[in-house]
Amino acid sequence: MTGKQEALQATPSSAPVAAGPGTSVTALLKAAFKPLASLRLTIVCLACAMFIVFVGTLDQVQIGVYEAQLRYFKSFFLYFTLPGSNFRIPYFPGGYTLGAVLLVNLIAAHLARFKFTWKKSGILILHSGLILLLIGQLVTSIFEEESQIQLDEGQTKNYSESPYFDELAIIDQSKPDSEEVISVPASRLIKGQTISLPVKGLQLQVDESYENAALINPNQLPSPNYPHLRLGPMAVAVAIQKTYKQNERNQPTAAVTLLKDGQAVGSWALSSGFPQPVQFRIGSDPFEIIFRPKRYYRPFSITLEEFKHDRYAGTDIAKNFSSKVRLVDPSAHENREALIYMNHPLWYSDLILYQAGFGNNDKTTVLQVMKNPSRLLPYIACGMMALGLVIQFGMHLVSFVRRRVIA
C-alpha cells in the first residue's frame, strides 16, 4: 500500500487541478483556452493554408478562378468524388475551416497568455486588427454580391444580372403597371423534383435537367433517338460537360411542367442559351416563363447616354473607355448624371459600379456591380495593424533612446 501511495504522489502535476474556493474564473478560462492557444496549431493551420493556396492556384488553370475560390477557399472541406458516383469524401480542411481555427487560435492565445499592460498596447491593437481582417474576409465571402449591367446607348435598366448563376423565372403579367416574378435557381432544377412555388396551388415539376448544354440544329443529332430537348423547330439542346473556363458560360437547360392544383398548365423545354420567353395563361391571367441569368432588381434605374472608347493614336490598343450614365432613384429623389471610367467607379447606396467592358462596335457598355457590406473593414483593419506596429516600435525606440541617454 505504501509503495502505491508513493507512486501516486510522485506525479501529482499531471492530474487536472480541481477548482477550489481560491481558484479564479480567469485562471479557469486560461486553462480551458490553453490547448486552443497552441503555437503548433497556428503553424499547422498556416502550413495547410499554404497548401490550399498552392493547389488552388494550380487548379484554377483547369477550373477557372471563380470555381477555384468556391472549392478551395469558400468551403469547409476539400472533397474527393468517388469515380462513377456522386458520393463525396472530405480529405482536407478548406478556407472557411482554416480561417475559423486561426481566428479561435488567435483569440485563445490572448485569453490564455496575454497580460494587458501599456507596454503591450501596440500588440493588442495589432492583433485586434488581424482579428477584424479575418472577420471582414468571412463577411465578404458570405455576403458579397457580384453582377453586371449591360446597356446599349439609350437603354434603361433597373436590374443587374449574375455572370455565374441562372434562374427559371415565371412572370405574372396580369397587372398593367408592374410584374410579379417567381424565380427558381438553376441549382434547384434536379430531374424528378417537384418544387412548390410561393403562389397558392402552383408547383414546378422537373422532367429533365442538364447542367450545361450545347444548342444545335436537329439535323446535327447523331441519331433521332439521341437524348436531347427540343427548344424549337430549329434548335435542340444536348447535354455536355460543365465548363469552368473564364471566357465561357454554362447553359443550363431543363424540361419542366407547371402544375396548378395538381393539373398540368403546360410543359416546356427551356435553356439559358436560348432566353426566349414562352407565353401562357392561367385562367385569364397572362404569364411568361423564361430561363435567364439571375437578376438583382434595384430601387433605381440607370440609362446609358453615351459610351466612349479612346485608343492610342495609330493603334487599336484601348487608352480609355467611359460611360456617361443617368441615375434615377425616385425613392431618394435622385436624378443625376455620372461618368464611369477606368479606375473611377460610381458609388451609390451600398453598390459600386465599375467600367468592366464594352461590345457591339462600341455601342454597348458592361458595368460591373459589386455589393460588399464589409468593404470598409479591410481598410480599418490595416489601419489598426499599422497603428499597432507604430505604437509598439515607438515604445521600444523611446526606451532604447532613454537607455542610451542614461548610459
Protein language model regions, located:
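Membrane-proximal extracellular juxtamembrane segment immediately upstream
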Residues: 62-89, 93, 339-400, 405
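A short, highly charged, low-complexity intrinsically disordered segment
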Residues: 10-14, 401-406
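Soluble non-transmembrane domains of integral membrane proteins
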Residues: 142-372
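Membrane-anchoring signal-anchor transmembrane alpha-helices and their immediate flanking context
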Residues: 2-148
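Generic, ordered loop/turn and secondary-structure boundary motif
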Residues: 34-37, 42, 59, 74, ...
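Internal alpha-helical transmembrane segments
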Residues: 40, 90-177, 368-403
